[in-house]
Amino acid sequence: MEWLAGGVTAPAGFVAAGACADIKGNGAGKKDVALLASRVPCAAAGVYTTNLVKAAPVVLTRGRTETGELQAVVANSGNANACTGEQGMRDAAEMARLAAEALGIRPELMGVASTGVIGVPLPMDRVSAGIRAAAAALSPEGGADAAEAIMTTDTFPKQAAARLEIGGATVTIGAMAKGSGMIHPNMATMLGFVTTDAAVDAAALREALREATDRSFNMITVDGDTSTNDMVLVLANGLAGNPRIMPGSAHYRAFADALAAVLIHLAKEIARDGEGATKLIEVRVKGAATLSDARKAARAVCGSNLVKAAVFGEDANWGRVLAALGYSGAQFDPGRVDLWLGDLQMMRAGEPVAFDEAAAARVLREKEVVFTADLHAGECEATAWGCDLTYDYVKINGSYRT
């Protein structure tokens, strides 16, 4: 696999754009409507928020991906279209209709996504104008603008692209994502849009996306909140001309691993961009009895406010890590645990190890802080990502609606 510059328009046959509709009505000039389209219909799959309260676009798009086919996606930032009742459902459907009309495709082939403030009706006159502007600007170079248009409190757009060989054909995968707050397992944890020119059976695409999501977006946590709006969609248009990837086929594993690598890259970017964050936290758990235990343990440490605050304060308080492991639900013997901060061992076989506080402080001053725990309970391992907890997180979320 080879990494490429770009995002959702890196694969053949995809165009995108971002436009300013001033959805929040503040005249800030921010791009807030994104449009992504393939020149042919695509196999499609999605994963969606586990929050019982689901936004209108989530309900609409989830129903449409059950058919296994989409051709385009329209998304807005600045307004979640969540908790907006029947009018919200009508507005989501109208977004799909307007975008489909501009593209000359059937509305049923449109996915819809929204992100922003909950409980406020969409200003459909502005949204409509934004969709028309985005449609007029569609181009193979528009991926960066689309990635910018889906941002809310993000401090930078998040894109990734990679290519690999499958059956003698070059296959490309591109993606964009947004997210910095309300990021917490389980899926989905943010907005993500993935494109590929691979020929993939819809069932194989669903399986690969679920697997990749479990290894990436479901392994990040910023603040313990799961949004009403989160989704990840993948569209595969088949223009690469590779042998069609089926579940369990010879090429499935290579494709699924490449998809996971792209999503892991974006997941880490989201964790790095956590609201107010100054450091990326990576937690590696090995020696777990089951994969589920490894994932539980890693996520618990990343999600611990005490661990996150200690990392922000550059305090090597490793006891907080062990405490989080203990309440994670993973089964292990605390008397066998080994624990490291970077390359510094903090605990061996359940006993504290003397370490150089100055060296620990140097590790904690880095922009990426890694904890490794060996549970010595089995052979399974997992990695999770998060960020430190800072004063700015409270400032950002204390004034979000303004």
Swiss-Prot record:
One cellular-component annotation, GO: cytoplasm
Membrane-crossing residue ranges in chain numbering: none
GO MF entry, a single one: glutamate N-acetyltransferase activity
GO BP terms, alphabetized: L-arginine biosynthetic process; ornithine biosynthetic process
Main EC class the enzyme belongs to: transferase
Pathway(s) the chain acts in: Amino-acid biosynthesis; L-arginine biosynthesis; L-ornithine and N-acetyl-L-glutamate from L-glutamate and N(2)-acetyl-L-ornithine (cyclic): step 1/1; Amino-acid biosynthesis; L-arginine biosynthesis; N(2)-acetyl-L-ornithine from L-glutamate: step 1/4
Top-level taxon of origin: Bacteria
InterPro entries with a match to the protein in the record: Arg_biosynth_ArgJ (IPR002813), ArgJ-like_dom_sf (IPR016117), ArgJ_beta_C (IPR042195)
Function: Catalyzes two activities which are involved in the cyclic version of arginine biosynthesis: the synthesis of N-acetylglutamate from glutamate and acetyl-CoA as the acetyl donor, and of ornithine by transacetylation between N(2)-acetylornithine and glutamate.
Protein name (database record): Arginine biosynthesis bifunctional protein ArgJ
Gene: argJ
